[in-house]
Each structure stands twice: as structure tokens, then as C-alpha cells.
């Protein structure tokens, strides 16, 4: 049996498991429970998106791209932001594609938080903010918000 305290870094060992994982485990063992967690859509991926994926595979596009994203996708994101929001971003220098929201949040926090920096985290919030902040050596400062204030940070 592996003693994880001996092989994992202390910063990882000291991260508490998310309470939502326990909830998922409990709800998965119960009949008739409808999960409202994790933000999975309640519809299939649209056919044109699935077809584009199939076409890419058939064309042999199965290799790694640049670690910041495929050049064609980066340019399209830049064009979309210009068309929809009138914002200009340089696709080679100002856009990064990630595999999902959690990776994007992790990269952003790692890019701006230094050891010892305090990071204000309004609650309720996404479960990853606090552990990622701790992993980079930041100090989470939890601010509880209330429904009667529309969950806005107040004094």
C-alpha cells in the first residue's frame, strides 16, 4: 500500500478534498437522484461539431498543436471577439486555449499569484479557487456573501 504522505508534496497532501466529490459519491449510490452538479449539458454535442471532429481525425489531424492552441482556432477566437464584442486581441500573443475552465483558472492563478499573496474568494464559489490558490502559495481570504445581497461582496 502506498503512503501518499511520503510520495506527494506537502502542498498537495494538505489540500482538503472538495465536499462536492462526497456529495457526488452519495448521490450516485441513491436511486432517482438527478445530478445538478459539474455543469454537464443536458443535450448532445451538436452534429456539426461532432462532424468537424470526425473530419479532423479522417484528415490525420491527430498530432500535438502549439501548447497555446491551434493557430486557426486562435485566429477564429480573435475574429469572434472582434465581431461580437469589438475587442481586439492578437491571436499569437493574447489568446490561450485550454482544455477546460479548470485549467484556465489554474493557469490564470499561477500567472498572477505570488507566494504569500492574499486572494479574495467570495463564497459561494467554484470549488477549485481555494485549493489552486493554496497550491501556488497564495493565502485564500474567504468572503461569505448572502442571497439577500444578491451574493455581492459588501462591507
Question: What is the predicted role of each segment?
Answer:
Residues 2-4, 9-100, 107:
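N-terminal small-domain helix-loop-helix segment of the aminotransferase-like
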Residues 61-155:
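Conserved core of the PLP fold type I
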Amino acid at each position: 500500500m502506498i503512503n501518499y504522505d511520503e510520495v506527494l508534496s506537502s502542498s498537495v497532501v494538505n489540500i482538503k478534498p472538495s465536499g462536492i466529490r462526497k456529495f457526488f459519491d452519495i448521490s450516485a449510490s441513491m436511486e432517482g437522484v438527478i445530478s445538478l452538479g459539474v455543469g454537464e449539458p443536458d443535450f448532445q454535442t451538436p452534429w456539426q461539431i461532432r462532424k468537424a471532429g470526425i473530419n479532423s481525425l479522417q484528415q490525420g489531424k491527430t498530432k500535438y498543436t502549439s501548447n497555446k492552441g491551434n493557430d486557426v482556432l486562435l485566429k477564429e477566437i480573435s475574429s469572434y471577439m472582434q465581431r461580437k464584442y469589438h475587442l481586439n486581441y492578437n491571436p499569437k500573443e493574447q489568446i490561450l486555449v485550454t482544455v477546460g475552465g479548470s485549467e484556465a483558472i489554474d493557469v490564470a492563478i499561477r500567472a498572477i499569484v505570488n507566494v504569500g499573496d492574499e486572494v479574495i474568494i467570495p463564497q459561494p464559489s467554484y470549488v477549485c479557487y481555494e485549493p489552486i490558490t493554496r497550491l501556488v502559495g497564495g493565502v485564500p481570504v474567504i468572503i461569505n456573501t448572502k442571497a439577500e445581497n444578491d451574493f455581492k461582496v459588501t462591507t
